[in-house]
């Protein structure tokens, strides 16, 4: 399974990043996803041995 790090915690799963994040109780649009130092879209499909860092973003005025 792929490893996704969110707010200092690790989660495992295979599938679309946004769907996995939602299943773990996070709002997928609130994060930027980084794989191997490169930003990737939230609809990226991840699988075995891949690593993703989810970085919380802030917006507003």
Regions flagged by a language model, labelled:
Residues 1-60:
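Ubiquitin-like/PB1-type beta-grasp interaction modules and other compact soluble beta-rich domains
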